[in-house]
């Protein structure tokens, strides 16, 4: 192999590595495109038969819980709003704190932004509810992050707002499900619910 051919081969591989690494830093949707923070997406369970579409679920009264509805064909779309916004970049990055907001209204007259609820006395789990944080967890309850699983295009959602408060000590957790009275609710502190993002 000539020196020029070898140099071209090395440069092509370095370029491919750089491109692959930069794409790997972003959340990608079901079409393989980076998820953008100004677009609506449906969050789908990556494992079919795992409960249906993400939606608002009534557990007791207001606020609504975030859950899955097997009878809802679409569920509600969400908007992802990063804690640190870069005006020149619309893509949602992996492992960065962000807000998850359902694009829907409620009869509770409150925000449909996801937040971490208090630990449930019966299940010991922390449910994902909606509304602006009322300082239940030091006003950091509305910040979640998306992390890659070993499978391309499949992610976990975590609550661990260390970007919002780097010096804080959080009891971090990954979002999973709880089945309660015929309802499927999202909660931390159990098995993870792998998800995919589908552009609306």
From Swiss-Prot:
Gene Ontology, cellular component aspect? apoplast
What the entry lists under InterPro entries is as follows: Kunitz_inhibitor_STI-like_sf (IPR011065), Prot_inh_Kunz-lg (IPR002160)
Kindly list the residues the record flags as site (Important in determining the strength and specificity of the interaction with its subsrate): 169
Q: List the disulfide bonds.
A: 62-108, 160-172, 165-168
- Indicate the secretion signal residues: 1-24
Q: Where in the cell is it found?
A: Secreted; Secreted, Extracellular space, Apoplast
Enumerate the GO terms in the molecular function aspect: serine-type endopeptidase inhibitor activity
Q: Which UniProt keywords apply?
A: Apoplast, Disulfide bond, Protease inhibitor, Secreted, Serine protease inhibitor, Signal
Q: Which sequence ranges form a coiled-coil region, renumbered to this chain? A: none
* SMART domains to which the protein is assigned, alphabetical: STI
UniProt entry tagged with the keyword Endoplasmic reticulum = no
Under the subunit heading, UniProt states: Interacts with SCP1.
Listed PANTHER family: KUNITZ TRYPSIN INHIBITOR 2 (PTHR33107), KUNITZ TYPE TRYPSIN INHIBITOR 104 (PTHR33107:SF31)
Family classification:
Belongs to the protease inhibitor I3 (leguminous Kunitz-type inhibitor) family.
Descriptive protein name = Kunitz type trypsin inhibitor 111
Query: Which species does this protein come from?
Result: Medicago truncatula (Barrel medic)
Q: What's the gene?
A: KPI111
């Amino acid at each position: 192999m000539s020196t020029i051919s070898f140099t071209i081969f090395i440069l092509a591989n370095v370029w491919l590595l750089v491109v692959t690494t930069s794409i790997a830093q972003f959340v990608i949707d079901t079409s393989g495109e980076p998820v953008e923070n100004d677009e609506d997406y449906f969050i789908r369970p990556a494992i079919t038969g795992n409960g249906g579409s993400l939606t608002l679920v009534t557990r007791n009264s207001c606020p609504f819980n975030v859950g899955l509805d097997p009878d809802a064909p679409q569920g509600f779309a969400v908007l992802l709003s990063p804690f640190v916004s870069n005006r020149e970049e619309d893509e949602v990055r992996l492992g960065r704190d962000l807000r998850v907001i359902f694009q829907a209204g409620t009869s509770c007259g409150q925000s449909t932004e996801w937040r971490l609820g208090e630990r449930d006395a019966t299940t010991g789990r922390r449910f994902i509810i909606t509304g602006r944080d009322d300082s239940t967890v030091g006003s950091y309850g509305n910040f979640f992050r998306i992390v890659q699983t070993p499978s391309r295009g499949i992610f976990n959602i975590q609550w661990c707002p260390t970007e919002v408060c780097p010096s804080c000590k959080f009891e971090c957790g990954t979002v999973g499900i709880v089945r309660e009275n015929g309802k499927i609710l999202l909660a931390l502190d159990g098995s993870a619910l792998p998800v995919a993002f589908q552009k609306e």
